[in-house]
């Protein structure tokens, strides 16, 4: 029999509908004032299940359509082993305001790069970098396969489940997540447009490509300890740095990169492409030998842990720069999408395109 066709994505089953509980959260959990972290939209507190005494994390959001969307998308993604799991969601009144209370598994292992920085003498290797990128890639692959772009993949949103060596790395904070299927797509049951500009059907590419850029930056830092784009003046994000990001100006300086193969540098180049539509997709990334066959990746010792230790006081700036770069990118891509859709529905442009295609077809016919 012929081999089965290759599947683009493993078939994931999406979690069944989210049931929001209306009873008071304090019926079921003991809420403490211990702050675990600050999410994009609010603090995260430590809480304990009254039934099992197990520890969980609680995120509080003021109820509004944006908060509902965050909860809904995070809930759908919550099946993935590399995404922080939502356990319960409550709608309660708090200080007279309607709030959504999200109970999540507690990730006690700290941030990705703190863990690498705190290593003793054993070197961090290229193979470990590949394994880490694979687990982050699995989270993104899951999201993209169910048409969600996270749009805020950055170091502080990557946390370990525990301090143990075998801990699992998970992606958190869905405050900027976005559904990428265009519901108002141009194809209706009785009308399939004969020709549609690819930019009208492909705006979701932009949102997803934001995640791919993040993968490139994180992979770069994993391999050397510093980011590809940084501001020279110690400002959070300088005009010069914005230009470098836009122009894709970065290097692979020695000694940190001298032992890293050309193939790996090429993978980073394909993730950091300045034109979002040319960036590698998550499927291509997951199929790359460096990711797919991480057991074959050489155990080259890297400079990462030493550089992170030496630049410890710069790390807050690095995080701020990435936060800022992602914010700029989200705004830019929204504007590009709007402009492309306007261009695509501009009758004069459409006429010119039609003419050009007719000429092209005629030329091919000869």
Curated annotation (Swiss-Prot):
Encoding gene per record: MAPKAPK2
Catalytic activity, EC: 2.7.11.1
Source species: Oryctolagus cuniculus (Rabbit)
Family matches, as Gene3D superfamilies: MAP kinase activated protein kinase 2, Phosphorylase Kinase, domain 1, Transferase(Phosphotransferase) domain 1
Root EC class: transferase
Stretches the record annotates as p38 MAPK-binding site: 332-356
Reactions it catalyzes: L-seryl-[protein] + ATP = O-phospho-L-seryl-[protein] + ADP + H(+); L-threonyl-[protein] + ATP = O-phospho-L-threonyl-[protein] + ADP + H(+)
Keyword Ribonucleoprotein appears in the UniProt entry: no
UniProt keyword list: ATP-binding, Cytoplasm, DNA damage, Isopeptide bond, Kinase, Nucleotide-binding, Nucleus, Phosphoprotein, Serine/threonine-protein kinase, Transferase, Ubl conjugation
Entry PTM: Sumoylation inhibits the protein kinase activity. Phosphorylated and activated by MAP kinase p38-alpha/MAPK14 at Thr-188, Ser-238 and Thr-300.
Record comment: activity regulation: Activated following phosphorylation by p38-alpha/MAPK14 following various stresses. Inhibited following sumoylation. Specifically inhibited by pyrrolopyridine inhibitors.
Family affiliation: Belongs to the protein kinase superfamily. CAMK Ser/Thr protein kinase family.
UniProt binding sites for ATP: 36-44, 59
Alphabetical list of InterPro entries matching this protein: Kinase-like_dom_sf, MAPKAPK_C, Prot_kinase_dom, Protein_kinase_ATP_BS, Ser/Thr_kinase_AS
Subunit structure: Heterodimer with p38-alpha/MAPK14; this heterodimer forms a stable complex: molecules are positioned 'face to face' so that the ATP-binding sites of both kinases are at the heterodimer interface. Interacts with PHC2. Interacts with HSF1.
GO cellular component: cytoplasm; nucleus
Motif Bipartite nuclear localization signal 2, chain ranges: 351-355
Segments of this protein annotated with the region Autoinhibitory helix: 294-330
Residues spanned by motif Bipartite nuclear localization signal 1: 337-340
Main location: cytoplasm
Pfam families membership: Pkinase
Gene Ontology biological-process entries: 3'-UTR-mediated mRNA stabilization; DNA damage response; inflammatory response; macropinocytosis; regulation of interleukin-6 production; regulation of tumor necrosis factor production; response to cytokine; response to lipopolysaccharide
Protein name: MAP kinase-activated protein kinase 2
Entries under SMART domains matching the protein: S_TKc
Sites bearing Phosphoserine, chain numbering: 238, 294
Annotated compartments: Cytoplasm; Nucleus
Function of the molecule: Stress-activated serine/threonine-protein kinase involved in cytokine production, endocytosis, reorganization of the cytoskeleton, cell migration, cell cycle control, chromatin remodeling, DNA damage response and transcriptional regulation. Following stress, it is phosphorylated and activated by MAP kinase p38-alpha/MAPK14, leading to phosphorylation of substrates. Phosphorylates serine in the peptide sequence, Hyd-X-R-X(2)-S, where Hyd is a large hydrophobic residue.
Motif Nuclear export signal (NES) positions after renumbering to this chain: 322-331
